[in-house]
Amino acid sequence: MPATPSLKVVHELPACTLCAGPLEDAVTVPCGHTFCRLCLPALSQMGAQSSGKILLCPLCQEEEQAETPMAPVPLGPLGETYCEEHGEKIYFFCENDAEFLCVFCREGPTHQAHTVGFLDEAIQPYRDRLRSRLEALSMERDEIEDVKCREDQKLQVLLTQIESKKHQVETAFERLQQELEQQRCLLLARLRELEQQIWKERDEYITKVSEEVTRLGAQVKELEEKCQQPASELLQDVRVNQSRCEMKTFVSPEAISPDLVKKIRDFHRKILTLPEMMRMFSENLAHHLEIDSGVITLDPQTASRSLVLSEDRKSVRYTRQKKNLPDSPLRFDGLPAVLGFPGFSSGRHRWQVDVQLGDGGGCTVGVAGEGVRRKGEMGLSAEDGVWAVIISHQQCWASTSPGTDLPLSEIPRGVRVALDYEAGQVTLHNAQTQEPIFTFTASFSGKVFPFFAVWKKGSYLTLKG
């Protein structure tokens, strides 16, 4: 927009063009000049000219029809805008040059062919546009506030969940500590019991041995005395003395009974397993916490035309009527299969799938390599880049080469898949019974993706979580 140098704002009282003093009870005549009311002659004093007109402005001698004289217009509040060139009040606005105009500017040659209107009229379209923009901004502000409110609610829900999980973790570890403390007390009590049994049997052993030592001491003393007797006395009871002197076999008692020794050995073996049990528990806990149970969804760009995905991309079902979908090098066209998203090139990950089979239907659940064949006939084996189990109503087998029949106690209605990329393992469990289904070992290169296939009407798979 061009600058408007003709505009100035007067902050002092404008002067009267007749008396040159400050305006008092100012009025503006139609030509635009401003005077004090007392300085402006009365209309009757100005008189009618021969032309039938009345002089309304003593300065410029502008005339108006006598029958339609214009009354003086009161001057607006002080400090209003005046033309810098003519010193007159601004009444008009030029749309072409975007300039403010006084009466003289309006009548000048520069703006004769331009669109000129009163300020109040000229400003209206701008006010309308501003109001429209204001409404749009207000709506945008309200929408942002609504979004902020919703996000704050989500945040509050998440914080509440975190607080709940913190409580669950604390409760779980408190219970674990209580259980460990209880087991510690039981083990120590058992050890004290064994210790008491040892001391008891030791006391019994010492008592028996002491009694035997005392008996033998008395016999030794008696025999020593016999040896000092004269021959006539010694021979009197020779047979009795001989029988008493015969060696009696002393059965030495065992300090610890074999039964107690067995109990101690058995308990010792249990104690030896404690460090290993603790190590395994610690490793399993760490392994469980390291596993990424992130959200898995189905990738529509890879889905066969025979599959229908749910709006949330968590469920897939088979349809006999192939869908009209754009062709893509990523899309399966030989097998009713679909990949999950995202793919993985490191770490531990797991996901769970609910299985529902229609009459004669089946499904495949596992992982597939990034380069798995997607066009034409494809194989389902580890050699083809697929590590999965194939499930039907009657049987379940692993995609090894050749396939491995899996004699399970029941056909899984849910499968939990655990991927350990660095270890090169894909482990599948029955999600309901926790029964192991199969474990693949492989050397992965590149990304691997969750892999699903389903066939026959009425068959579908649903990702959990």
From Swiss-Prot:
Its EC number is 2.3.2.27. Keywords: Cell junction, Coiled coil, Cytoplasm, Metal-binding, Nucleus, Transferase, Ubl conjugation pathway, Zinc, Zinc-finger. It catalyses: S-ubiquitinyl-[E2 ubiquitin-conjugating enzyme]-L-cysteine + [acceptor protein]-L-lysine = [E2 ubiquitin-conjugating enzyme]-L-cysteine + N(6)-ubiquitinyl-[acceptor protein]-L-lysine. It is found in: Cytoplasm; Nucleus; Cell junction, Focal adhesion. Pfam families: PRY (PF13765), SPRY (PF00622), zf-B_box (PF00643), zf-C3HC4 (PF00097). GO terms for cellular component: cytoplasm; focal adhesion; nucleus. SMART domains: BBOX, PRY, RING, SPRY. This is E3 ubiquitin-protein ligase TRIM15. Its main location: cytoplasm. It is an enzyme of class 2 (transferase). Residues 126-229 form a coiled coil. The gene is TRIM15. The lineage of its organism: Eukaryota, Metazoa, Chordata, Craniata, Vertebrata. Zn(2+) binds at residues 83, 86, 105, 111. Residues 276-465 form the B30.2/SPRY domain.
